[in-house]
Design a protein with these regions (language model features):
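C-terminal ends and interior cores of transmembrane alpha-helices
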Residues: 87-107, 304-319
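Juxtamembrane intracellular "pre-TM" segments in multi-pass secondary transporters
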Residues: 2-13, 200-234
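Short amphipathic helix-loop junctions that connect adjacent transmembrane helices
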Residues: 35-50, 251-268
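Helix-to-loop junctions at the C-terminal end of transmembrane segments
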Residues: 64-81, 282-295, 382-383
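C-terminal transmembrane helical hairpin of 12-TM major facilitator-type secondary transporters
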Residues: 296-343
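Loop-to-transmembrane helix entry/capping segments in MFS-fold secondary transporters
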Residues: 48-52, 141-150, 265-266, 351-363
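A late C-terminal transmembrane helix in Major Facilitator Superfamily
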Residues: 354-382
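Intracellular juxtamembrane helix-capping segments at the cytosolic ends
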Residues: 125-139, 338-352
């Protein structure tokens, strides 16, 4: 009985936070491997349009989280746990989707590669919204900032580990071996949700046990109670603009650094993980920092920091010192992790009903649409000007986030 209790996902225990973080770590490993893959493909001849196409299409499942939420809220098998059921299914499917990449040659952006990575991302999206809903359901309000720090920190650390390992393996051995290592690492992280136990009720609502299904009326009522207010509207505006600049950066930075600044793909692939690891540490500490500093100050500081990284990149040319161009690659992920942890704790606090997957999925759907917009407009922004113009545009796209972030962190 004591062993089962120790694996119960409640009260912010070590196992509770560790299990949530393990799922996030798995998602980070996947994302880091994709970052390394785009760098590798650019280094062997892929264009900005190729990378834009790859990232845009593989991002589509993330934008559909708005529609995945109601499904995850409405259907489950409580014997496996309301959210854990979906986490287990999606984690297994994530690994199966990339299994073919262990065997087929990957030397360009093509239809098969796009299809496999899109399927993989679809299951990652299901896992993501399920674990977010699990966190919103199982954590008390005063635990969310700290837990989000560990969760997002783990995801960012996972990205760094995934990108560093994949870069080394892609350039030294090949893409097939890189995806084999990814599957092995995701299988290891899968142990935590596999052996966990989930509460049968939302934290703080012990008298209302979960049901296997929610009716349409219950779903609509739950969404309405959480989403029809000014704070939720401001949060949606924030998320709609949050990732446009990051999406532009991800599409163009490889070509910019390789063709304009004279870097190699391996140099990029080895350096960027340091920013992700720094972001992981910032993410882990961001929740704790809110104890000593106002959340508003920290959120606006990180948003401003990301804008400054983009503006700095707009000034780079071949004569720019290497330490300065290196700081931009490191900084973009470091500051992104900081504001992400803070805004996600705010979003989870807005999910006050049993429709957490739908509520959080709406917020994250807007965030992923934002990334999709950035990925898609990057070639056109670059075509309308130059790299400097594209980076300035990325910085300016953060202005609505600064304004809505100020509103969301009011006392």
């Amino acid at each position: 009985m004591e062993l089962i209790k120790s694996r119960l996902l409640s009260e912010g225990s070590v196992w509770h936070i560790g299990s949530l973080s393990a799922v996030y770590l798995s998602q980070g490993l996947s994302g880091g491997t994709l970052f390394a893959l785009t760098t590798y493909l650019v280094s062997i001849g892929a264009s900005v349009k190729d990378i834009s196409l790859l990232l845009s299409i593989t991002m589509i499942p993330w934008t559909l989280k708005i529609f995945l939420g109601p499904i995850i809220d409405s259907f489950t098998l409580n014997r496996f746990g309301r959210r854990r059921f979906w986490i287990l299914i999606s984690q297994v499917a994530m690994m199966l989707a990339v299994m073919p990449l262990v065997f087929i040659e990957v030397s360009e952006v093509n239809f098969l590669l796009i299809c496999l990575l899109t399927a993989h991302n679809a299951f990652v999206a299901v896992s993501d919204i399920s674990v977010d809903a699990l966190a919103a359901d199982s954590l008390n309000a005063d635990q969310m900032a700290n837990a989000n720090g560990f969760m997002w920190g783990s995801k960012t650390l996972g990205r760094g580990i995934g990108m560093a390992l994949a870069t080394s393996i892609f350039f030294s051995y090949g893409v097939n071996e890189g995806f084999l290592i990814l599957i092995i690492l995701m299988s290891t992280a899968f142990i935590f949700p596999l052996f966990s136990e989930e509460l049968s009720y939302k934290a703080g609502q012990q008298n209302e046990s979960y049901k296997n299904r929610l009716t349409l009326g219950e779903l609509i009522a739950g969404v309405s109670a959480s989403m029809f207010n000014r704070s939720a509207f401001a949060a949606m505006i924030f998320m709609l603009f949050a990732n446009i600049g990051y999406g532009i950066f991800d599409v163009i930075y490889n070509e910019f650094y390789i063709e304009e600044l004279g870097w190699s793909g391996e140099e990029i692939g080895y350096l960027r993980p340091f920013g992700m690891w720094l972001g992981g540490l910032i993410g882990l500490s961001a929740g704790l920092l809110t104890i000593y500093f106002q959340k508003r100050l920290l959120l606006l500081l990180f948003i401003t920091g990301q804008g400054l990284v983009f503006l700095a990149a707009s000034t780079f040319d071949p004569s720019t010192p290497t330490w300065m161009t290196s700081m931009a690659i490191i900084g973009v992920d470091a500051v992104d992790a900081g504001w992400s942890v803070l805004i996600f704790s705010i979003l989870m606090a807005l999910c006050t009903t049993n429709t957490s997957a739908t509520n959080f999925g709406i917020f994250m759907g807007f965030g992923n649409i934002s990334m999709l917009i950035g990925n898609n407009i990057a070639p056109y922004i670059l075509g309308a000007g130059d790299y400097s113009f594209a980076f300035v545009f990325a910085a300016l796209s953060l202005i609505p986030c600064w304004l809505t972030g100020y509103y969301l962190t009011r006392s």
